[in-house]
Amino acid sequence: MQIFVKTLTGKTITLEVEGSDNIENVKAKIQDKEGIPPDQQRLIFAGKQLEDGRTLSDYNIQKESTLHLVLRLRGGMQIFVKTLTGKTITLEVEGSDNIENVKAKIQDKEGIPPDQQRLIFAGKQLEDGRTLSDYNIQKESTLHLVLRLRGGMQIFVKTLTGKTITLEVEGSDNIENVKAKIQDKEGIPPDQQRLIFAGKQLEDGRTLSDYNIQKESTLHLVLRLRGGMQIFVKTLTGKTITLEVEGSDNIENVKAKIQDKEGIPPDQQRLIFAGKQLEDGRTLSDYNIQKESTLHLVLRLRGGMQIFVKTLTGKTITLEVECSDNIENVKAKIQDKEGIPPDQQRLIFAGKQLEDGRTLSDYNIQKESTLHLVLRLRGGN
């Protein structure tokens, strides 16, 4: 049966239960759905508070009954924490909680490490080892949260697109660290970043202090294409892929980049430029491939063929196979594409059911042949 649980905020939760479930079980289900620990839950039905050891049947709770959920604060209070941005966070606390605990709760909610938090109440900065009671902080008191930057500063990084990134840094951070922070935020590899301040390009080994970069300074980020060029790769489907390359990259590297972007294994790639197939060991420069050149990508099927698999719903699946593939391999490829377990697949060709241990060649299955897929229901044969 289903029952409903209504909270003080007016939200209604639906639970699947049995009459024999005890109240403890019901609280565990509420915890699963809402994350509220059982010891903070009070459940009320027909004006009565329900006891953990009793069952729903004991209280004559039937399908589609509505329980009311009231939160029991263990130490009995809520407090508020206001940030400099004006956001207010609500915390459930006890008078005996120390300031360290409170900072940990703020970290849980907001992700701000405790060592970057300063909490202020009644104009005083609160010390970690003291408790809320020590400072006479009572229910619904408001604390103020100020961020302590360890080295004490924020700087800005402006990109060529006009976007501004804010970073938390210390004067002692070196430029390499700053580039790593930019990579964390924006995903740009450090070796593609050039940082400019006051007209100077910043060197990795130097620190922000070395360049007299102070709080709220703005750096400019310019992207460095390592070898300095972009090329395009056009597929037979008409899709164009953009790659960042260097003239000294060999064709093998280029195929690896295509694999990273598109997932196509290098041994299935043939690259064509100016009518010539490019060889793995040669470089882009060898072929006079320059910035914004377009290569053409043709897929090489290793065993050299495509076959089709038609399902009872009329859907046709295309598979890349080799004549030497056995039927088991083919079923595994169908599983990869369609999620159908091999043991539920029966494959038919030319009126014959294909056996797992045999190969496509055994059945004279050639390129562009069509197999038929019939589902075998596990209970059947």
From Swiss-Prot:
Entry keyword Heme: no
Q: Kindly list the places in or outside the cell where this protein is found, as annotated in its UniProt entry.
A: Cytoplasm; Nucleus
Please give the SUPFAM superfamilies that the UniProt record associates with this protein.
Ubiquitin-like
Indicate the residues removed as propeptide on maturation.
381
State a GO cellular component annotated for this protein.
cytoplasm
Q: Name one GO molecular function term.
A: protein tag activity
Q: Does the keyword Ubl conjugation apply?
A: yes
| Pfam families noted in UniProt | ubiquitin
The protein's UniProt keywords, in alphabetical order, are: Cytoplasm, Isopeptide bond, Nucleus, Repeat, Ubl conjugation
Q: Superkingdom of the source?
A: Eukaryota
Chain positions of cross-link Glycyl lysine isopeptide (Lys-Gly) (interchain with G-Cter in ubiquitin): 48
Q: Could you tell me which residue ranges the Ubiquitin-like domain spans? A: 1-76, 77-152, 153-228, 229-304, 305-380
Q: Cross-link Glycyl lysine isopeptide (Gly-Lys) (interchain with K-? in acceptor proteins), residue numbers?
A: 76
Q: Name one GO biological process term.
A: protein ubiquitination
Biological role stated in the UniProt entry: Ubiquitin exists either covalently attached to another protein, or free (unanchored). When covalently bound, it is conjugated to target proteins via an isopeptide bond either as a monomer (monoubiquitin), a polymer linked via different Lys residues of the ubiquitin (polyubiquitin chains) or a linear polymer linked via the initiator Met of the ubiquitin (linear polyubiquitin chains). Polyubiquitin chains, when attached to a target protein, have different functions depending on the Lys residue of the ubiquitin that is linked: Lys-48-linked is involved in protein degradation via the proteasome.
Note, other: Ubiquitin is synthesized as a polyubiquitin precursor with exact head to tail repeats. Some ubiquitin genes contain a single copy of ubiquitin fused to a ribosomal protein. In D.discoideum there are 9 genes: ubqA: 5 copies of Ub and a final Asn; ubqB: 1 copy of Ub and ribosomal protein eL40; ubqC: 1 copy of Ub and ribosomal protein eS31; ubqD: 3 copies of Ub and a final Leu; ubqF: 7 copies of Ub and a final Asn; ubqG: 5 copies of Ub and a final Leu; ubqH: 5 copies of Ub and a final Asn; ubqI: 4 copies of Ub and a final Asn; ubqJ: 4 copies of Ub and a final Asn.
**Record family assignment:** Belongs to the ubiquitin family.
Name of the protein this chain belongs to: Polyubiquitin-H
Question: Where does this protein come from, organism-wise?
Answer: Dictyostelium discoideum
**What's the encoding gene here?**
ubqH
